[in-house]
Structure formats: structure tokens, C-alpha cells
Amino acid sequence: VMWILDGYTVTDRYPLSQRESLETMTDDSLQDSGGFQTLPTDEINYLRNSVKVTVDAYDGTVTLYEWDESDPILKAWQGVFPDAVEPRSEIPAEVMVHLRYPEDMFKAQRYQFQRYHVTNASEWFEGSSRWEVPQDPQNDKKLQPPYRLFSDVGSGDTWSLTSVYVPRNK
């Protein structure tokens, strides 16, 4: 039995990029709010799912696997700790079939897409075409979580995340 976790590289110092609260971007009615206490700052402007982590449930062995091979922050850490992260090619096939797109990454991207989906400059500056993730009908203080879908798309079973947007302030 293995636990699989997603490892992220984050910073608040990426040039020419707006900072946002990670908690705000990932908060919804299903989110446990205790996970952000280990971050030195909640505001980030760079987020990559750079590492997949496995934890052996029997003996506690932790293995880090490089997932995003082009991440410069991960490359810097690998320069300091060269043996800490295994190459992506070393991920066992029986683990690879269980890897999923990270939900927190999806939530951060959907948060940004609310504003940055607009391609017309005047509409972007006016904010007239902005979207928002709707509130959860069962908890009006929290956002609706993404839908988790498992379906057969012809080429086999597929797991996916999807989300709904509504026009902002309408």
C-alpha cells in the first residue's frame, strides 16, 4: 500500500507576476483549512506541481519523483540535494497509473482563469467579462468544489476535474 502526494514548488518572488493568496485560490466547501500553516507566506505568484511523492504505508519510506522536468526551482533544489529526487523515468508503472492531476493546482488555475480568460484588452480592463466560481449551494460562505468525473471516453476509463463559472456580479 502506497500513499501518493503532490509536491509543489512555490515562490512569491517570480518577476512580473501578480501575487495571490494560495488559500483563497484553493479554498472551497471541501477544503480543510489547516494545510497552509507551514508556508512562510500565503501569497504566491508561482506554483508548479514539480514532484510526486510516494509513502510506503508499512515502513514509512518516502520517495520523491521529479514530475515537472523543466521547473527551475526544482532544478535549483536538485543542485543542492542531488540524490533527494528520483528522475521521472524511475516512477514505477504500478504507481504511474494512479497519478492524477492535482486538485489544488486545478483550483489555483480556475481562480486565475476567472480574470485572465478575456482576450479583448478593453473588456479586460473594464472587468466586464469576468467570471467567478459560484458559491456552494450548501455553504454560501465557500466556493463550489470542482466536480470529479470518472468516465469511459472510448479509449478507457478517464479521471478528470471540471468546474463551473458564472458571470461575475450578475
Question: Model features per residue range: what roles?
Answer:
Residues 1-32, 36-54, 125-170:
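Exposed beta-strand-loop-beta-strand "reactive/processing" segments of non-cytosolic proteins
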Residues 2-6, 19, 25-44, 49, ...:
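Extended, regular secondary-structure scaffolds
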Residues 73-170:
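Accessory, solvent-exposed terminal regions and/or long lumenal/extracellular loops of proteins
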